[in-house]
């Protein structure tokens, strides 16, 4: 650490390298914070979480009870032990509350004055944060599993919506209507995600075992249907390609948008090149997944080696994205975890579970001390630690 600081001060090292190394160290030290609670409001399981990208201060949660809660994550009391309080909530007595389970909540990417929610009640709602009133409501014929707004687009205000039907619907917030329908899947759409790199690139995952990449400006169908065998097993038409051997119920782009992670009920996670659709063949081992709906997982941002956090039963498994190595299992929930979200400013993780709790995972403030009867040599250290701190640190 001192070597990095000295090199940065003298201009020998790029400041970004120090930041990435420290971010990596903090992610590797994530543990359940016993001094921080998140106020318990939900009477049912937590299905979805989202932290606004403007300040990284406010978090939305949506539950199986139809309730939406807005939390302030900042420690305004400056005390070591504190509770993240609910600023407001859309409870059962609210006139516009969702009638059934809320499956997805998302902040408007450019402003905290608006957020969206979708539910099993077949609606997508657009909310005014200040008044907690609906600004618009989109009604669908089928149950809504997932929706997503582009985190980078300044050219369109399209919300991609996945429902129990096989069609992906694009809702335009400007016009207040469904402007596009993407056809190609054969069963329900369990997850949708816009690329964080390109305005018009959308990924969709379905119960038909397929993942498709779309350029929504094109009228001629999808760009690519991902093939787990990279075209080697069969030279059949692209429509026969499958990404998993079960339902695909989770999607997540890496922060740079160059790769796409998918999870399926075949207990596998796969990493894809998002530009050509190639399966990178990274082996993550068994990733337990028996969810019958969308699984919300997340990736780190700004680390030397990026990490992916995946709900795994009542735990959260942490893997190195590009090597597939399992770093740790975060244990603290009593029931199945359905969602997690990463706070990149402070390298924190928040998770929601069917035990009705939201837990905060924060970097430990101390170095782990080995047992007296153990000797830890450099060769025994986790390779991710070696990536985080270079030899120049030891010399400093």
UniProtKB/Swiss-Prot annotation:
Q: What does this protein do?
A: Substrate-recognition component of the CSA complex, a DCX (DDB1-CUL4-X-box) E3 ubiquitin-protein ligase complex, involved in transcription-coupled nucleotide excision repair (TC-NER), a process during which RNA polymerase II-blocking lesions are rapidly removed from the transcribed strand of active genes. Following recruitment to lesion-stalled RNA polymerase II (Pol II), the CSA complex mediates ubiquitination of Pol II subunit POLR2A/RPB1 at 'Lys-1268', a critical TC-NER checkpoint, governing RNA Pol II stability and initiating DNA damage excision by TFIIH recruitment.
The name on file for this protein is DNA excision repair protein ERCC-8
Matching Gene3D superfamilies, A to Z?
A: YVTN repeat-like/Quinoprotein amine dehydrogenase
Q: What organism is this sequence from?
A: Homo sapiens
PANTHER family on file: DNA EXCISION REPAIR PROTEIN ERCC-8
Q: Which residues carry this modification: Phosphoserine?
A: 390-392
Single GO cellular component term: site of DNA damage
UniProt xrefs under PROSITE patterns? WD_REPEATS_1 (PS00678), WD_REPEATS_2 (PS50082), WD_REPEATS_REGION (PS50294)
Write down a Pfam family by its short name. WD40
Please indicate which superkingdom the organism of origin belongs to. Answer: Eukaryota
Enumerate the GO terms in the molecular function aspect: ubiquitin-like ligase-substrate adaptor activity
Which chain regions cross the lipid bilayer? none
Asked if Heme is a keyword of the record, the answer is no
InterPro entries attached to this UniProt entry? G-protein_beta_WD-40_rep, Rad28/ERCC8/Ckn1/ATCSA-1, WD40/YVTN_repeat-like_dom_sf, WD40_repeat_CS, WD40_repeat_dom_sf, WD40_rpt
């Amino acid at each position: 650490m001192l070597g990095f600081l000295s090199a940065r001060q003298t201009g020998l090292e790029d400041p970004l390298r120090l930041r990435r190394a420290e971010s990596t160290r903090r992610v590797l030290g994530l543990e359940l914070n016993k001094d921080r609670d998140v106020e318990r409001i939900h009477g049912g399981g937590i299905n979805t979480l989202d932290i606004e990208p403007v300040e990284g201060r406010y978090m939305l949660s949506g539950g199986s009870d139809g309730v939406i809660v807005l939390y302030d994550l900042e420690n305004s009391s400056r005390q070591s032990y504190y509770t993240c309080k609910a600023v407001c909530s859309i409870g059962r007595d609210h006139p516009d509350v969702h009638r059934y389970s809320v499956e997805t909540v998302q902040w408007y990417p450019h402003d905290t004055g608006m957020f969206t929610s979708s539910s099993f009640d077949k609606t997508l709602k657009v909310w005014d944060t200040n008044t907690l009133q609906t600004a618009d409501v989109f009604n669908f014929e089928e149950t809504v599993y997932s929706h997503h707004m582009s985190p980078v687009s300044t050219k369109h205000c399209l919300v991609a919506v996945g429902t129990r039907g096989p069609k992906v619907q694009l809702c335009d917030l400007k016009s207040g209507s469904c402007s596009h329908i993407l056809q190609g899947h054969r069963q329900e759409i369990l997850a949708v995600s816009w690329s964080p790199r390109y305005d018009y690139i959308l990924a969709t995952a379905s119960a038909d075992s397929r993942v498709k990449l779309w350029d929504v400006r094109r009228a001629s169908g999808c760009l690519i249907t991902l093939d787990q065998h990279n075209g080697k097993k069969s030279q059949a038409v692209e429509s026969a390609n499958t990404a998993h051997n079960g339902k695909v119920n989770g999607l997540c782009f890496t922060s740079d948008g160059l790769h796409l992670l998918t999870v399926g009920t075949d207990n596998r996670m796969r990493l894809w090149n998002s530009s050509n659709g190639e399966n990178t063949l990274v082996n993550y081992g068994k990733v337990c997944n028996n969810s019958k709906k969308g699984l919300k997982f997340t990736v780190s941002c700004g680390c030397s080696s990026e990490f992916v956090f995946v709900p795994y039963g009542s735990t959260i498994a942490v893997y190195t994205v590009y090597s597939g190595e399992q770093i740790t299992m975060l244990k603290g929930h009593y029931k199945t975890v359905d969602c997690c979200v990463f706070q990149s400013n402070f390298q924190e993780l928040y998770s929601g579970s069917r035990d009705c709790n939201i837990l905060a995972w924060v970097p430990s403030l101390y170095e782990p001390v080995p047992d007296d009867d153990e000797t830890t040599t450099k060769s025994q250290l986790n390779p991710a630690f070696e990536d985080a701190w270079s030899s120049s640190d030891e010399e400093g």
